[in-house]
Amino acid sequence: NHVCNLYLQNKKLLPTKVIGYKHPGDKVYMSEKMVDMVIPLLKEQKYLNIVEKFNNQTVDVDLDLFRKIPMNFNLDEVRWYFHLTGVHTDLSNPYIEVKNHQKIKDKVVIMRSTRRKNIFINYKFINNYKDILFIGLEEEYLDLKKEIPNLEFYDCKNFLEAAEIIKSSKFFIGNSSFGFTIAEGLKIPRLMESFPEFPVIYPNGGLGYDFYFQVHFEH
């Protein structure tokens, strides 16, 4: 068992060749807002002793070196960090811990990026069910509400609250977005909408399933 300090560097510039790999116009790895959103979640993890913004603290392992490994820059699979630390762990076990949300519980929770939508999939049948909640960006919510008119929206104050809502859900549905990353770490029941152009994200362990076609999504 290890207890580590983690320092997050905000506004670090992306290499010129990969600018916009997350969103058009992105020029940094993590914005200050993104760092502020994720720190409360990371501070809840028992294996992290200190979590704060980087300010020239001593660093033993620079996790940004992951981006210098000779492989596709867009690969977001967490296991590739094993090759930096030399520590291999069982990714079928939970590696994120949070409490249940005090108020929002037993919802079907969705976070779906508009950039990674599967063109073979629609969510219209979900309108037949109740207690469907979207967390994430409002523009993404409005996009999905065209298919699910009774879809509700909640604006989380940070990723810790998002994780608490996901943990308290009936199950989670998402595509390649930070919401699925959280659900994957929690190992709660989850469905992953595979992205045809880059299907590299998939569940490991627990009640996790991915789908590529509509018939499998609905059944």
Spans of model-derived segments:
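Catalytic machinery of carbohydrate-active enzymes
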Residues: N1-H219
